[in-house]
Every structure is written in structure tokens, then in C-alpha cells.
């Protein structure tokens, strides 16, 4: 820009209305702080690197790390020096502004010259102010030249201060293709893992829902039907036993279920054999004859079935003769306490009277036998 073409009013106004040198000095202080931090970082980085490689970490890996990190330390030192130079240049620009500011006339002085010139011209009726007007114009020309010179000097100093050494970025110390290779390796490693997880998930789902279990559970109906059939057969058996009095007439079912102490050999149809072979007597003639008679009786009844009521039964089902038994020894069984003897047959169904040969007072009974126990002292 040609500052000589601009009047002093413009140059003075630009110089006095700007931000001044304060911003340049603040920038210089910031560059000084940055230069100090970079220098400190470079020293600490170099110290740690030297201690690590010399004392704690040795070998090819340590040497490779030191060779790779050394350029970065150099870049820190170089950048710190350039930053310090920038701060110096900023101060130089601030100094150039201060000099130009001091050389530039204040705008009020220039304005006063113009006001004086106008007053002289207004009162110059007879030419008496011609010399004063010329002096005022000369003074204004000097102001013009002074402001132009100040601006030219400031432009030159500012241009010199703006000549800075460009900053350079740090050199790449890592492998640029390392991230790509790492991503590829991770992808290659995760693909089989994802396939394995999917396979395991499918296998677990197949285990939790087995295919051999039907969805309608109809097979349970057959199980329940079989159970019901078994229950019906048990009910029929109980009905027949209660109707014909098989327990009392045959003497083969539920023998001694009421009281074991009242069971006798006659209840099983072997009373005569037991009496014939009683201890101390040996086998007597009567016993032998009895046995023979028993055998002859069986042989004589071949081909003819015994009858109980209207029912034909085998000969071995004859009603046995019973007799009272003697009391058991203290070491034997004792009479179990119980309730009254229940009647035969099912409730509501008439039964057949007990055979006359059963002299024992023991009668068969059905249902649950209730037992009353005394209250023990330990229960409180």
C-alpha cells in the first residue's frame, strides 16, 4: 500500500484506533510458554528414554524403540526453538508498532491544523492572513509526510517480523499399515468365533426342545387307562371275597392278619400232621394212621370237587379245623391291642356265614385298623 497517497487524517486514524501492541505482546507471551513446555517435554522424554534403554530394558526391542523415538525428541527440541523464535518475532512486531505509533501524529493535532486553516481563510478579507495560511499549509504537509514515513517504517518492520521459519510436523514413527493389519487379524479371528458361538447356540436349542417328546402327550392316556384297569380288578376281587366269604370258608387268605398270636397249624390244614409228629412222642401209630387216612381221603376224593355254597372249589380248599392254642411264652408274640372285630364282606353286600369248624374267635375284617397310643410324657 502507498501510504503517501493517504492524508494524515487517515493514517493517524488507523494507527490510533487499532488494537495496539497489546495483542502482539500477549501472543509473544503465549509463544514463550509453548516454547518452554516443548523444551521441558523434550528433556523429560529423552531422560526417560535413556533410563529405560540403559537400565531396565535391553535387547533388540529396546534398541529399535530408541532408534524410533530419537527423531521425535529431536523434533521437540526443534519445535521449541522455532516457537521461541516466533515469540521474538511477535515482540519485534510489537516494537515496530510502538515506533510507528510514536511517529504518527495524533488525529486531534491534524484536525486542529485544518480548523486553523479554515479560520484564516474565512477572515482573510484584505489578504492579511496570506502568510499564516501558507504556514498552516506547510505544517499540514509536514504532517502528511511524517505520517506516511511512520507507516512506511511500520510496514517494513512488520514485514521483517512476519518472516518466520515454518513449522514441520513430526515424522511418522509407527507403521501406517499396522492398523489395517490389526483390523484384518481381528476380523479373521472373530469369524470362526462367531461361527462357533452360532453352532453352540443351535445345539443348545436342540437339547432344550427334544424331538422325541410328542406335543399332545396322548401317551399318558394309555398309562392312566392301565392304572384304572388295575384298580377295577382289585375292586372286583374285594367284592367276590366279601360275597362268598372266601376268607372264612377257605382259610387261605389273610390268615393271621388280625392277631399272629392266635394262628394255629390247623388254620393251614396241617394240624393232624403236627400232632402226629409232636415232640417226645415220635410218630405214633395213630399219627401214622391219621396221615394214611389223610392220604386215603385225598385219593378217595379224586374226581370230585368240594363245594362252598354254589361254588366248586378244589379238594385242598376244605375248611380246616381249628382249635384253641395255649398261651405263648414271655419271649414270644403278645396279643396286639386293637379295635373290635369287623364283620366280613363288603359294606351293603350279604356275606356267607363262617364255617362251623372255625372254633377260634378270630374273624377276618377289612379296612384300616385304628390304634390308639398313649400320650408320651416327652410330648409335654
UniProtKB/Swiss-Prot annotation:
SUPFAM superfamilies: PE/PPE dimer-like. Disruption phenotype: Unable to grow on minimal medium with trehalose or glucose as the sole carbon sources or in limited medium containing trehalose. Resistant to trehalose analog 6-TreAz. Slow growth on minimal medium supplemented with maltose or lactose as the sole carbon and energy sources at both neutral pH and acidic pH 5.7. The supplementation of glycerol or glucose promotes growth at acidic pH, but reduces growth significantly at neutral pH in minimal medium and on solid agar. Changing residue 87 to T: Resistant to 3bMP1 compound. Defective in uptake of propionamide, glucose and glycerol, and is unable to grow on them as the sole carbon sources, but grows normally on hexanamide. Keywords: Acetylation, Cell outer membrane, Membrane, Transport, Virulence. One of its GO terms (molecular function) is glycerol channel activity. It is found in: Cell outer membrane. Interacts with PE19 and PE25. Small molecule-selective channel required for the uptake of nutrients across the outer mycomembrane. Transports glycerol and glucose. Involved in sensitivity to M.tuberculosis growth inhibitory agrichemical 3,3-bis-di(methylsulfonyl)propionamide (3bMP1). Transports maltose and lactose disaccharides. Plays a role in response to starvation and stress, likely environment within the host. Inhibits canonical autophagy in infected mouse RAW264.7 macrophages. Inhibits autophagy and enhances intracellular bacterial survival when expressed in human macrophage-like THP-1 cells. Inhibits Toll-like receptor 2 (TLR2)-dependent signaling leading to autophagy inhibition, increased intracellular bacterial survival, reduced phagocytosis and reduced secretion of interleukin 6 (IL-6) and IL-1 in infected mouse primary bone marrow-derived macrophage (BMDM) cells. This is Transporter PPE51. It comes from Mycobacterium tuberculosis (strain ATCC 25618 / H37Rv).
Amino acid at each position: 500500500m502507498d501510504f503517501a497517497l493517504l492524508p494524515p487524517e487517515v493514517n493517524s486514524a488507523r494507527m490510533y484506533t487499532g488494537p495496539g501492541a497489546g495483542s502482539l505482546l500477549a501472543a509473544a507471551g503465549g509463544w514463550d510458554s509453548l516454547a518452554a513446555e516443548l523444551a521441558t517435554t523434550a528433556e523429560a522424554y529423552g531422560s526417560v528414554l535413556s533410563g529405560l534403554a540403559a537400565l531396565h530394558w535391553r535387547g533388540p526391542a529396546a534398541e529399535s524403540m530408541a532408534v524410533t523415538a530419537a527423531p521425535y525428541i529431536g523434533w521437540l527440541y526443534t519445535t521449541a526453538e522455532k516457537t521461541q523464535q516466533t515469540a521474538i518475532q511477535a515482540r519485534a512486531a510489537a516494537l515496530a508498532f510502538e515506533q510507528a505509533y510514536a511517529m504518527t501524529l495524533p488525529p486531534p493535532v491534524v484536525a486542529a491544523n485544518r480548523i486553523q486553516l479554515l479560520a484564516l481563510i474565512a477572515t482573510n478579507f484584505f489578504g492579511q492572513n496570506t502568510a499564516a495560511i501558507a504556514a498552516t499549509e506547510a505544517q499540514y504537509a509536514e504532517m502528511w509526510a511524517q505520517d506516511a514515513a511512520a507507516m512506511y517504517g511500520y510496514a517494513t518492520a512488520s514485514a521483517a517480523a512476519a518472516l518466520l521459519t515454518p513449522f514441520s510436523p513430526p515424522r511418522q514413527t509407527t507403521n501406517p499399515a499396522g492398523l489395517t493389519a490389526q483390523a484384518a487379524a481381528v476380523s479373521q479371528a472373530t469369524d470362526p468365533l462367531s461361527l462357533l458361538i452360532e453352532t453352540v447356540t443351535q445345539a443348545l436349542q436342540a437339547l432344550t426342545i427334544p424331538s422325541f417328546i410328542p406335543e399332545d402327550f396322548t401317551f399318558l392316556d394309555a398309562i392312566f387307562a392301565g392304572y384304572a384297569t388295575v384298580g377295577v380288578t382289585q375292586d372286583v376281587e374285594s367284592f367276590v371275597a366279601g360275597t362268598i366269604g372266601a376268607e372264612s370258608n377257605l382259610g387261605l387268605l389273610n390268615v393271621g392278619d388280625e392277631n399272629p398270636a392266635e394262628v394255629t397249624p390247623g388254620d393251614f390244614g396241617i394240624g393232624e400232621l403236627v400232632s402226629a409228629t409232636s415232640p417226645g412222642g415220635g410218630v405214633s401209630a395213630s399219627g401214622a394212621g391219621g396221615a394214611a387216612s389223610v392220604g386215603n381221603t385225598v385219593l378217595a376224593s379224586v374226581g370230585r370237587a368240594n363245594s362252598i355254597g354254589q361254588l366248586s372249589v378244589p379238594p385242598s380248599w376244605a375248611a380246616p379245623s381249628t382249635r384253641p392254642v395255649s398261651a405263648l411264652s414271655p419271649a414270644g408274640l403278645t396279643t396286639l391291642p386293637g379295635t373290635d372285630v369287623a364283620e366280613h364282606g363288603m359294606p351293603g353286600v350279604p356275606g356267607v356265614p363262617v364255617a362251623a369248624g372255625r372254633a377260634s374267635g378270630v374273624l377276618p375284617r377289612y379296612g384300616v385298623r385304628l390304634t390308639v397310643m398313649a400320650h408320651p410324657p416327652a410330648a409335654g
